[in-house]
Amino acid sequence: MSSHSSDSSTPDRGRLPHHREVSFRSPNPSTPAGEQILRRLREELVLWLTTVDATGAPHSLPAAFLWDEAHSTFLISSTAEEDRDRLIQIQQNPKVGLHFNLDLSGADSFILTGEAKVSLDDPSFDQIPAWVAKYQAFFSQVGLTIKQAAVVSPVALRVRPVTMIARF
């Protein structure tokens, strides 16, 4: 008998949770996975935004975000000066990755691919009630008012998710 065989009574602790890639649809809150994804979209403060430079090398940076359920898009704050390279990369290639933090087991993780663009239509972040509600306590802990944070990161990126890879 192979040491890799398992029966249904023994958990397989050596394997990562099953993952699958699917076209993105707004998560269904009536399913356990959909409920968990929506909770993370609403509550997590940071995701990792991955862009690709002209040579094809990926670059991942943490970013504050707001899930816009009405439009099924992400609103991501970006600084104009420090993120200049990222903004150029998005103009050259709008395909991006959005990675959410995971635990050491790799369970409860999901990665999205999408298309990003600089948004000129969104108001300043301090004028968006959902943004203020989500980030006010965080910024106050680091010594910034929500208005100061909006001045530091004035560029709005909109990301439309295309695919999702999830492990649940």
Question: How would you describe each model-predicted region?
Answer:
Residues 87:
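Hydrophobic-ligand binding "helix-grip"
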Residues 81-84:
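Mg2+/Mn2+-dependent nuclease catalytic core
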Residues 19-48:
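Short, basic/aromatic recognition patches
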Residues 44-79, 96-100, 111-112:
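Short beta-strand segments
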Residues 2-29, 107-168:
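Charged, gly/pro-rich active-site loop segments
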Residues 104:
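Short His-centered aromatic/hydrophobic patch
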